[in-house]
Amino acid sequence: MFKVEKTLAATAMLATWLSVGVQAALAQDHHSHHGGEPAQLTLNNGKKWATDENLRQGMAAIRDGLVAELPAIHGDKASAGQYHALAKKINDQVAFMAQNCRLDKEADTMLHLVLTQLIAGADAMSGQKSNKAKYQGAEKIVHALEEYAVYFDHPGWQGVKVK
């Protein structure tokens, strides 16, 4: 019963993030705690932030899903359905990571900045906008994965190779 409630709570939280706009929500939260300075990814005293297995699993699944679609995306042959399916995979993994997060508070705060970029990219890919906007959404996902590699310790991480 507790697991079902936890799943429902995580799903509701993700839906709220998506409907309100994660970037605005995070920016507002950061603004209220730090005098209006924008939230920014930083290292943990010069070191990458620790990760847990759930985070590594979710980020690897996002990377793998994107890599599988890159030939079609770069060839301008990705259909709206392909973009939408990729966006769903990304949102599913973001929900999984949010539901199963075991990071300390500071690492979690940094992770939310990466998740914000992932959600923004997924939103652009699943929207009713042009293929150019969908392509730009995929670029946001690539950028988020690059930042993840810079700021988080994920042993064996292989980034996305963009042509």
Could you say what each language-model-derived stretch is?
Residues F2-T11:
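Bacterial N-terminal signal peptides that target proteins for export
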Residues T11-G21:
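Bacterial N-terminal signal peptides
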Residues L26-A78, W157-V160:
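Immediate post-signal-peptide N-terminus of mature secreted/exported proteins
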Residues K48, A72-Y83, D104, D108, ...:
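Alpha-helical rod/repeat scaffolding segments in eukaryotic adaptors/tethers
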Residues A60, D64, H84, K88-A95, ...:
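Solvent-exposed, polar/charged alpha-helical surfaces in well-ordered, non-transmembrane soluble domains
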Residues Q93-H112:
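Short, solvent-exposed, charged loop/turn and helix-capping segments
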Residues N100, L111-K163:
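Helix-rich interaction surfaces within compact, conserved domain-sized segments
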